[in-house]
Amino acid sequence: MSERFARLESLAGRWGLSGLELVGKGLEFSVYRARGRDGRPVAVRLAHRRFDSNANDAQVDTRALLRQEYEIARHLAAHGLPVAEARELFLADEPASPDVLLSAYVPDDGTGLDSYALGRLLARLHRVPPPPLTPVASEGVSTARAITERIGRRWARIGRLVDDWPEPPDASLIAGRLAGLTEDSLVHLDVRSDNVRCRQGRPVALLDWSNALLGAPSLEFGRLVEYARYPENELDVEAIRSGYARTAPVPPDSDPCLSVCRLDAALMLALVFLCEAPDPSRGPAAADHARELALRM
């Protein structure tokens, strides 16, 4: 049993929680299901460390991510979007104590994701006024600059892992393609089956807003196209587009932002499969795909 989990169990009694059970684990957080004082199921999101690092992102501020999750969930719930209700945010006073977010636990019936319904939900999300916050993933700069800089950073990181890796795309070319990018919408940027709770295939909650940015729908679609290459994400991009088009215009494939956002996503996935969750088949193939996208630009 880890020291942080032992500390969590101690705190759980103080918060009136019982029956902690691990239900998910990622790079920065573990998620437990528990029962609250009122008998309702609760999701307990626990940061592994105060600051974390991985191949894609250095010095991840997990406290800032928990605060962002809390604020975004409350903002979207107030606008009628299906999210896991954020109940309480506990920020530790001591380094030994974990930061924890308590949310409503939203079950999934295992029926699979209806991509058409997901498209309709994403159109609703992108029309909601964005929350008054600076997303953690923006690193305190504009979305266009954040994407340009992380493409360069991740490209260089892959170059230390892959032989004969070429020079990166010119940063001015990337910035030029993002010149028209607005920040009028909240985009999730991690939409896949693991982060969508469903009932009879229909999305009933969007989870995990760690990657969120303020941007335009083209950012979301660039990420969706790349995620859809992996069947476990359960994404049918054409069905998503059809559902989205019921209430909002779908970004065209000719949108210059979309090609950049595809490259941004492809580089992230290449690093995932090269070193975060190493896969001897997917890693090199993902790096080759990212290189091809860059050459098209």
Residue ranges and their predicted role:
Residues 3-18, 114, 128-189, 288-294:
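An alpha-helical support segment within catalytic cores of ATP-dependent transferases
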Residues 27-140:
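ATP-binding pocket architecture of kinase catalytic cores
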Residues 29-35, 43-44, 173-219:
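Active-site acidic catalytic loop and adjacent metal/ATP-binding pocket
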Residues 80, 90, 126-133, 178, ...:
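A general structural signal marking secondary-structure boundaries and capping sites
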